[in-house]
Amino acid sequence: MYWTDWGSSPKIEKAEMDGSARQIIVTGNLVWPNGLTIHKATNRLFWADAKLDKIEVSDLNGRNRQLIMSSVADIHPFGLAVYHDMLYWTDWNTRGISNYNLSSGTKDTLVDGLQQPMDIHVFDPALIFSGT
């Protein structure tokens, strides 16, 4: 399992499903990390930082960290979901749901006019995880 911590030292952590083998995997250049989502096909972990207005990605151990998009793109992401080659997020600037094509790099607003969209989930029975 993976989680974020907005505490005095913001971080992303992971552990086994019984809480053992706890590890801090991402630190530094984080303030309000949230919206974790895993791209199962590529074993990559995506997250948003609601304070720094950016979306980042790393491998499942926090290595190979890369910036996907930042406030330069006029985003304020909160919740994230990934499905095939599309990254979806709730956006407080547009008050809607946007997406980003991970292959082409194109960005779109899909839904607008929401009040304060917090989270987003994709449902596809093929994406059900199994684990220990």
Predicted regions located by residue number:
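Short loop/turn segments immediately following the C-termini of beta-strands
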Residues: W6, A41, A50, L60, ...
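Short coil/turn segments within WD40 beta-propeller repeats
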Residues: S8-P10, L52-D53, T94-R95
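C-terminal interaction modules of eukaryotic adaptor/scaffold proteins
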Residues: D91, S98-I120
